[in-house]
Amino acid sequence: MSNIEKGHEHQMHSDADSREFLSFVLGDEHYALDIMSVKEIRGYEKVTKIANAPAFIKGVINLRGDIVPIVDLRLKFNVGEATYNEFTIVIMLNVAQRIVGIVVDAVSDVIRLADDEIRPPPEFGVAFDSRYLLGLVAIEDHMVILVNIERLISSDELGLIEQQTETVQD
């Protein structure tokens, strides 16, 4: 059985007791987020830098008239090298009625998970704050970290992004 077929074993649940997640890779780790927050997946493009922004906020882009902040999760989670080339991926998300782009190394698959497959997040042993986690799930021979994207791109950070993108538009 191929790796893709094994991954789809998790999709045997009815729609009522499961949710779909988009899985992606950062460094050597596998992550996933609720697919309902995904707007589109794009290649990385040049950003307009924002003065005094945290290092993980790379800047903003103009996406069909919307000014969209770009957050590099590799820097936010402190995993992997932050290189930007034609293979760099940006996942555009709808978070708190705002479009935000997140930079990842690769997008893997869509996985359907039942609530009982999701294990609670550990209080230690991960590279970032466990408040950003929905939980963990074992798929094939690795663990997938489920990210709470609304909490990760917190209202405080979105407020900072909002304030600085207004400055860019002026």
What does each of the following model-derived ranges do?
Residues 1-170:
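An acidic, low-aromatic, low-complexity terminal/linker signal
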